[in-house]
């Protein structure tokens, strides 16, 4: 961390070409594991958004006009700056986000990979020639930058889920205004500003404005922002989509999930349970792709539940500043109350808690619940906590029906030794991503990522899909001589 003798460069500030005083005041940066104050971040307001938009609009035209190789070089250099500081990024992820250290290092690594992949997008072919029914006419469709992109990023994977929009948007010639969540304003904001600034990003091209919902609302409402890329809850995503629709503003929404982990009777049970534990309890279940519904065939359900409960009981929950824990804290007290209410509601409705179901402060034990029915809230809700609800099915048709009864459609996993059967089931799921003999928390930066239904607006991040998201199509036609029209 670059510091003066007293404090880091970002202390109490926001990044808008340079580090400047925030018009919205300041907020504490808090460690969710113990409540310690780690620092102070600036808090933006609507005036900061307006100033950033004006600067971004001016800078974007020049940024888009420079050779693609120069834009790509800056993004790659920023990636190398991240690599140099990966342990610092990981440390902040632990202290700010409640992550265990391996999660922090993984996130720094995949963000680094994402940045290099995004830099490569700038050099991909940028246009398609189409034939014409008009003699002598040439039709060219090319991709051009959207303009100014507003990125509203979440707290759970603050670095990666910001970077998957920021890096490709910049590489493709856009200016970016990033609003990180206040709960992770350093990992998902200040440090990102530092690495791009150190890499030589021109003034005005990138702005980082930590803030609350009011800042997001100002970004959505500002006509100078041409696109909003939002990752977060479906509830908030619906509001953003509605407002962007009224303004005819491009929007990319990556929203919630209530993902299924389907286990057929022929599955490798140990493998299915191993995948289930990772896919449910990673980062305390605070992952949009986490396995939120375990659909298990009756023939193996009891064995599966017992094996998963045993794994859950062996997971150590505690302060992530120690390397000896598997699960850290939930992000805030509100989330603890919400998770526990879902567990208690399931118990009252007849479900059986085989492991966990208890908490102390923000630390929630890995929990396994048996006999969960589709009408229970724990089945219908995105839990965002370390809870594995198990629902029994008797046939493949029933499993597919149970999987598809949710409004969400983000990710799924299927366990079977018959790959053809797994593929057939995958094709019938209303789900954007399906992983056979794995778990649903999967992401590779070069592969299109996104969901169906209430899990998003239908767009995708990753590889060539990012070009579709962060550019727009322009048709140019040419003829050597003007046509002689009848009037």
Swiss-Prot record:
Instruction: Decide whether keyword Oxidoreductase is in the record.
Output: yes
State the organism of origin.
Answer: Pseudomonas putida
Q: How does activity depend on pH?
A: Optimum pH is 9.0.
| Quaternary structure annotation from Swiss-Prot or TrEMBL | Homotetramer.
The UniProt keywords, alphabetically, are:
Aromatic hydrocarbons catabolism, NAD, Oxidoreductase, Plasmid
Q: What does the record give under GO molecular function?
A: benzaldehyde dehydrogenase (NAD+) activity
Which residues take part in binding NAD(+)? 232-237
- Please report which protein family the annotation says this sequence is part of: Belongs to the aldehyde dehydrogenase family.
Gene3D superfamilies, sorted: Aldehyde Dehydrogenase, Chain A, domain 1, Aldehyde Dehydrogenase, Chain A, domain 2
Q: Which GO terms describe its biological process?
A: catabolic process
Broadest EC class? oxidoreductase
Q: Which InterPro entries match?
A: Ald_DH/histidinol_DH (IPR016161), Ald_DH_C (IPR016163), Ald_DH_CS_CYS (IPR016160), Ald_DH_CS_GLU (IPR029510), Ald_DH_N (IPR016162), Aldehyde_DH_dom (IPR015590)
Q: Where is the active site?
A: 254, 288
Q: This chain belongs to which protein, by name?
A: Benzaldehyde dehydrogenase [NAD(+)]
Catalysed reactions, semicolon-separated: benzaldehyde + NAD(+) + H2O = benzoate + NADH + 2 H(+)
């Amino acid at each position: 961390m670059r510091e003066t003798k007293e404090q880091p460069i970002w202390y109490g500030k926001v990044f808008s070409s340079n580090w400047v005083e925030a018009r919205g005041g300041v907020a504490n940066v808090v460690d969710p594991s113990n409540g310690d104050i780690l620092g102070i971040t600036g808090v933006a307001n609507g005036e900061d958004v307006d100033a950033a938009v004006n600067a971004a609009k001016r800078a974007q035209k020049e940024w888009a006009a420079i050779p693609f190789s120069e834009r790509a070089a800056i993004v790659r250099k920023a990636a190398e700056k991240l690599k140099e500081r990966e342990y610092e990024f990981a440390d902040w992820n632990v202290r700010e986000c409640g992550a265990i250290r391996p999660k922090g290092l993984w996130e720094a690594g995949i963000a680094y990979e994402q940045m290099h992949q995004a830099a490569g997008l700038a050099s991909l072919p940028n246009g398609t020639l189409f034939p014409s029914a008009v003699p002598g006419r040439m039709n060219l469709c090319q991709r051009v930058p959207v303009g100014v992109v507003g990125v509203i990023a979440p707290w759970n994977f603050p670095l990666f889920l910001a970077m998957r929009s920021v890096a490709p948007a910049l590489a493709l010639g856009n200016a970016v205004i990033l609003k990180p969540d206040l709960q992770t304003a350093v990992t998902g904001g200040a440090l990102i500003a530092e690495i791009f600034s150190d890499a030589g990003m021109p003034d005005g091209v990138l702005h980082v404005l930590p803030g609350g919902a009011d800042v997001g609302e100002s970004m959505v409402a500002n006509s100078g922002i041409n696109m909003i890329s939002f990752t977060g809850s479906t509830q908030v995503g619906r509001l953003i989509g509605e407002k962007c629709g009224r303004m005819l503003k491009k929007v990319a929404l990556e929203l919630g999930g209530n993902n299924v982990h389907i286990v057929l009777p022929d599955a490798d049970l140990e493998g299915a349970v191993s995948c289930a534990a990772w896919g449910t309890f990673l980062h305390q279940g605070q992952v949009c792709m986490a396995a939120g519904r375990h659909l298990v065939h009756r023939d193996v359900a009891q064995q599966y539940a017992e094996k998963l409960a045993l794994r859950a009981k062996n997971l150590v929950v505690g302060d992530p500043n120690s390397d000896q824990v598997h699960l850290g804290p939930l992000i805030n007290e509100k989330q603890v109350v919400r998770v526990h209410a879902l567990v208690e509601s399931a118990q009252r409705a007849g479900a059986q808690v085989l492991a966990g179901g208890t908490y102390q402060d923000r630390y929630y034990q890995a929990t396994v619940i048996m006999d969960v029915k589709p009408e229970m809230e724990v089945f219908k809700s995105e839990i965002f906590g370390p809870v594995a609800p198990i629902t029994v099915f008797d046939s493949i048709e029933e499993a597919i029906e149970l999987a598809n009864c949710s409004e969400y459609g983000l990710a799924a996993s299927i366990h079977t030794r018959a790959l053809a059967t797994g593929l057939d089931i995958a094709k019938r799921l209303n789900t954007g991503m399906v992983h056979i003999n794995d778990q649903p928390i999967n992401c590779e930066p070069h592969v299109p990522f996104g969901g169906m239904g209430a899990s998003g607006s239908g767009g995708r991040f990753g590889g060539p899909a990012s070009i579709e998201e962060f550019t727009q199509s322009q048709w140019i036609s040419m003829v050597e001589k003007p046509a002689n029209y009848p009037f």
